[in-house]
């Protein structure tokens, strides 16, 4: 019997994951002397690394698989060096001979960002941010001593070249996409001047590079621990502070930004054992805030405007608002006239409005009805009287139901979601769906229409259509704040209980 491409891909995925988990288990056994009692696959982050939590009866550890051996070596080296100095990083417990697998200390599941989202702008959360910045100062200064920067993953130092790269990233992937007039040569001259100014800082220590609240873990005793610093290099300490305090998703109040910066400078002075010129330190900090904000806009522009990924497009208005708030209230300490002209163009109300979607309000009559269904039962009827709406066929997406371990699961189960996000073209499919649907939703909100029907179908109405319908609901709520009625026709009828039957 012929084997389909879907079957081959499913088999390849299963074999690859089985090999990885077996290798992680074997490394654990060599380290501990016994096999783990259980192993959980953790959600994959933005990188290609895979994480696992391994348990015995008393503790858990994190297992990591990474095909990029250089990246693994950098993280392991930094961790071992920092651990010797009792800094807030995980202990490396074991490393495989091929350096593709390693075990590290487990700090739990709760990040500083989780604490902020749960607790809001409260004193206990502020104290965690302050504690994180105090630990950062120690990591930067003490971690720098004796560190071999030849071990860095990319550049050894965040100097003029790296600063220019971030500025050009913003220029090519966001500024030029606006098609606004500016003097290109004068702007390049200003980029050169700003890069020189920021690279000639008095203080250069270890720079985390991606110091954000999602990379800071908080244990039950409120102790602070850092992860994901393998992109670190030598650089200005202000960059990491700027990354944390101006993280768009955290959206910290101005008072917090000011007070936490003062807290950090106090901690930095205590760590280096001398006072700093706060005016100069603040001006250079402002420069790095700007670099970070522009780098983020470049990333959103590349992912959103060029790759057409909807979630990045919806992030642009907040990033522009952040940039406007900073630009109108802070000084760089350097004269860059064409650069200032460009920033004024970028934060103009018309540009922010250009990227801000129309949103529903309390009196908006529109209700979007989203359904998942099985093609075996036919396309669902639109009972609004409009004769139908969008129907998207998910059967071209590789089917998780062909994998034995996922046959009785649904599009809401973690293993299925991981499979669809990592092993199929579901993300590309949904980005195209979002582009199509957004046009109608925006128009219907403006014109006070009352109904829009959107349905997703697959073979059994269990995996792909369920995942896609849920994803669209999240997208529409986040972007348009519109009222939605969600119905999973097959799963609701079965009370989400699925027998193990063959899928096609």
Task: Write out the residue ranges for each language-model feature.
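Active-site acidic catalytic loop and adjacent metal/ATP-binding pocket
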Residues: 2, 50-54, 139, 194-241, ...
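Conserved NTP-binding catalytic cores of kinases and kinase-like/nucleotidyltransferase enzymes
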Residues: 11-101, 205, 219-224, 346-347
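An alpha-helical support segment within catalytic cores of ATP-dependent transferases
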Residues: 24-31, 144-156, 161, 166-206, ...
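ATP-binding pocket architecture of kinase catalytic cores
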Residues: 52-165, 176
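Active-site activation/catalytic loop segments of kinase-like enzymes and analogous catalytic loops
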Residues: 168-177, 238-274, 290-306, 319-327
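ATP/Mg2+ or Mg2+-diphosphate-binding catalytic cores
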Residues: 298-359
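C-terminal accessory "lid"/substrate-recognition subdomains
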Residues: 356-452, 492-494
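Catalytic cysteine-centered active loop of the rhodanese-like fold, especially the PTP/DSP P-loop
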Residues: 450-473
């Amino acid at each position: 019997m012929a084997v389909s491409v879907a079957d081959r891909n499913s088999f390849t995925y299963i074999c690859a994951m089985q090999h990885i988990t077996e290798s992680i288990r074997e490394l654990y056994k060599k380290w501990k002397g016994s096999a783990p009692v259980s192993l959980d696959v953790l959600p994959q982050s933005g990188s290609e690394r895979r994480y696992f939590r391994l348990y015995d009866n008393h503790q858990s550890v994190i297992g990591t698989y990474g095909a990029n051996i250089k990246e693994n070596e950098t993280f392991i080296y930094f961790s071992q060096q920092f651990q010797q100095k009792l800094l807030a990083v995980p202990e490396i417990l074991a490393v495989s001979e091929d350096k593709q697998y390693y075990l590290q200390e487990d700090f739990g599941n709760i990040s500083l960002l989780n604490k902020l989202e749960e607790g809001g702008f409260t004193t206990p959360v502020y104290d965690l941010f302050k504690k994180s910045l105090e630990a950062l100062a120690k990591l930067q200064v003490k971690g720098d001593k004796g560190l071999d920067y030849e071990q860095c993953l990319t550049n050894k130092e965040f100097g003029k070249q790296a600063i220019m790269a971030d500025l050009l990233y913003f220029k090519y992937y966001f500024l030029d996409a606006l098609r606004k007039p500016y003097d290109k040569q004068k702007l390049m001259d200003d980029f050169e001047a700003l890069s020189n100014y920021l690279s000639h800082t008095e203080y250069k220590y270890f720079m985390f590079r991606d110091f954000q609240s999602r990379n800071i873990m908080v244990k039950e005793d409120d102790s602070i621990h850092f992860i994901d610093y393998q992109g670190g290099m030598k650089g200005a300490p202000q960059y990491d502070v700027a990354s944390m305090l101006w993280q768009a998703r955290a959206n910290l109040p101005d008072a917090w930004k000011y007070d936490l910066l003062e807290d950090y400078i106090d901690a930095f002075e205590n760590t280096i054992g001398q006072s700093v010129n706060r005016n100069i330190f603040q001006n250079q900090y402002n420069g790095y805030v700007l670099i970070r904000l522009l780098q983020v806009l470049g990333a959103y522009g590349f992912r959103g405007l060029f790759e057409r990924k909807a979630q990045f497009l919806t992030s642009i208005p907040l990033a522009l608002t952040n940039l406007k708030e900073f630009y109108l209230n802070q000084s760089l300490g350097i004269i860059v006239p064409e650069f200032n002209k460009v920033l004024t163009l970028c934060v103009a109300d018309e540009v922010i409005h250009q990227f801000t979607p129309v949103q529903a309000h309390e009196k908006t009559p529109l209700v979007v009805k989203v359904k998942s269904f099985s093609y075996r039962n036919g396309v669902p009827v639109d009972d609004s009287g409009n004769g139908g709406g969008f129907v998207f066929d998910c059967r071209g997406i590789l089917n998780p139901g062909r994998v034995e371990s996922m046959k009785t699961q649904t599009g809401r189960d973690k293993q299925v979601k991981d499979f669809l996000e990592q092993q199929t073209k579901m993300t590309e499919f949904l980005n195209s769906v979002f582009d199509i649907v957004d046009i109608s939703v925006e128009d219907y909100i403006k014109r006070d229409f009352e109904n829009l029907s959107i349905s997703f179908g697959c073979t059994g109405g269990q995996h792909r259509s369920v995942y896609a319908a849920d994803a669209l609901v999240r997208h529409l709520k986040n972007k348009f704040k519109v009222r939605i009625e969600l119905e999973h026709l097959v799963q609701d009828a079965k009370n989400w209980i699925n027998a193990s039957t063959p899928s096609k």
